[in-house]
Amino acid sequence: MDLQDTIRTYRLFSGSYDIVFGPVFHPGRKAAVGIANDRPGQRILEVGVGTGLSLPYFRRDSQVTGIDVSAEMLEKARSRTARLGLAHVAGLHEMDAENLDFADNSFDAVLALYVASVVPNPARFAAEMRRVC
């Protein structure tokens, strides 16, 4: 799938994503965030934050930044963050996972839940995650 296909796909799914995929991926999402929550005060990047389903599960003493290529999915994540008062969410940005606009070693942990299968170049994606963490 190329980047434009991914953007189009998630634009289409943004309205129904939580209903269709939320319950299916919930156990894995919660388990992964639980692992990321192992230390207090971490700077965490969530690549492919989507509608922000995982954001409520991060420790409140962490600083979570989320990125996604879908503006429509990010709008839902921003609404969720505001509605739930998730002050630990430091920012939500429209960004390509293969070209992260962050300095080297900007984060203590990086999560990418269900993302590797939809990026055009998984090796580049993995290299970017290593670079920023």
Which residue ranges define each predicted feature?
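GHKL-family ATP-binding catalytic core of two-component histidine kinases
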Residues: 70, 101-103, 120
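A short glycine-rich, Lys/Arg-flanked "PGG" loop and its adjoining helix->strand segment in the class I
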Residues: 123-133
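Class I SAM-dependent methyltransferase SAM/SAH-binding core
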Residues: 43-99
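A short acidic, Gly/Pro-enriched loop at the edge of an enzyme's catalytic core
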Residues: 95-109
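Conserved class I S-adenosyl-L-methionine
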Residues: 1-39, 53, 76, 83
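A short SAM/SAH-binding and catalytic strip from SAM-dependent methyltransferases
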Residues: 109-121
